[in-house]
Amino acid sequence: MKETIVAQATPIGRGGVGILRVSGPLAADVAKAVVGKALKPRFANYLPFKDEDGTTLDQGIALFFQSPNSFTGEDILELQGHGGQVVLDLLLKRILQVNGVRLARPGEFSEQAFLNDKLDLAQAEAIADLIDASSEQAARSALKSLQGEFSNKVNQLVDGVIYLRTYVEAAIDFPDEEIDFLADGKIEGHLNDIIAQLERVRSEAKQGSILREGMKVVIAGRPNAGKSSLLNALAGREAAIVTDIAGTTRDVLREHIHIDGMPLHIIDTAGLRDATDEVERIGITRAWNEIEQADRVLLMLDSSDPDSRQPEKVRSEFLAKLPSHIPVTIIRNKTDLSGENEGVTQENGFTVIRLSAQTRQGIDLLREHLKQSMGYQTGTEGGFLARRRHLDALEKAAYHLRQGHIQLTEFRAGELLAEELRMVQSHLSEITGQFTSDDLLSNIFSSFCIGK
């Protein structure tokens, strides 16, 4: 028999309204015990909430939702009373006196909604993301995920893969039917379409992950280029020590900031040069480790340094060591000394921003550039939010699609193509929860609020 669970749905502490939520087969029994009568589904009732001996604990609104027409798909009772924590604790204690009712685990209401097919896994995760959203756009994107936008894109991919699997496996299982998919250009065409479609979803998911988790921006460059001054300017405080001595920063410095609500992880690193000092060499090694994991790199150049007036050499030396997939923005700092005008230009495929970290002139240009790099939009449009596990699943699916394409075009191996397509379907289905381990479900829902 399914269990009946209860939890406080509003935050712990004082408030105007406090809500307790009950879900499960005993929800109607709890209603009779607390308000003294059966409740008509989907009608608000203003009633006293009573203790076991009949004394009134509080009075408020009682709502009953009958299975399957509820958030969890089970019978649900909501008691909306006053928001004092003592009153809510007394009412919670009263509900737990009903035999068979227990406290809910974190995220258990959403888990029940998932298990009862009221939500898929990506939609359930979007509930927590909507609650935790730190900007208007993150909230709108989480809502789109909750409404199924991400899931619909994934399901379209799954449908395409299933179609291919059906075609390929039929040809393998029934060779007498003369379905020669190896010589059929349509199958390769469909496979290419799915690969392109998946890449578009991966790109959107990457942007959605940045909205949720923040973009990691690493400030890199030669010593004394003004990296620490730029960190301080973006952070709005003296987070890093700044001196005229080259090599002042020996270790990695991190600051978490928001630009119009968009989360940003700014990382200041040691100046890049051939160092003889052991401590500085360690700092430079750590700097490159951070650079290789960045979502974007700000390459700092000292515009007052004669060498930086020909930045191609500095840039080429740096880019030669940088992974090609990491975007780079070039910052020409110290315009107050060089006399260059603050502004943004496009040069040789790079965005170049001229500013002075010391005087803060041009910093707003950099802030706007970072916002746009993160996908900031002022309107109501926006994509979906994505989590790291979603990106991992999409990456694995993309890998097996590429392998399947090789099996088809180079080796004409039908059985191996079918197996790669099976793996693609499995990884995509992990996102929505069609094929998901119990351990993964436990980890996901345990991070939710109690009462959600």
From Swiss-Prot:
Protein's recorded name: tRNA modification GTPase MnmE
Cofactor: K(+)
Cofactor remark from the record: Binds 1 potassium ion per subunit.
Binding site for K(+): N224, T243, I245, T248
CDD domains the record matches: trmE, TrmE_N
Location in or out of the cell: Cytoplasm
Gene Ontology MF: a single term: GTPase activity
InterPro entries (UniProt xref): G_TrmE, GTP-bd, GTP-bd_TrmE_N, GTPase_MnmE, MnmE_dom2, MnmE_helical, P-loop_NTPase, Small_GTP-bd
Keyword Nucleotide-binding: yes
Organism: Actinobacillus succinogenes (strain ATCC 55618 / DSM 22257 / CCUG 43843 / 130Z)
Sequence positions that bind Mg(2+): S228, T249
Function, as annotated: Exhibits a very high intrinsic GTPase hydrolysis rate. Involved in the addition of a carboxymethylaminomethyl (cmnm) group at the wobble position (U34) of certain tRNAs, forming tRNA-cmnm(5)s(2)U34.
Domain of life: Bacteria
Residues covered by the TrmE-type G domain: 214-375
Annotated GTP binding sites: 224-229, 243-249, 268-271
Family designation: Belongs to the TRAFAC class TrmE-Era-EngA-EngB-Septin-like GTPase superfamily. TrmE GTPase family.
Subunit structure as annotated in this protein's UniProt entry: Homodimer. Heterotetramer of two MnmE and two MnmG subunits.
Residue numbers binding (6S)-5-formyl-5,6,7,8-tetrahydrofolate: R21, E78, K118, K452
GO biological process: tRNA methylation; tRNA wobble uridine modification
Enzyme class: hydrolase
Primary location: cytoplasm
EC assignment: 3.6.-.-
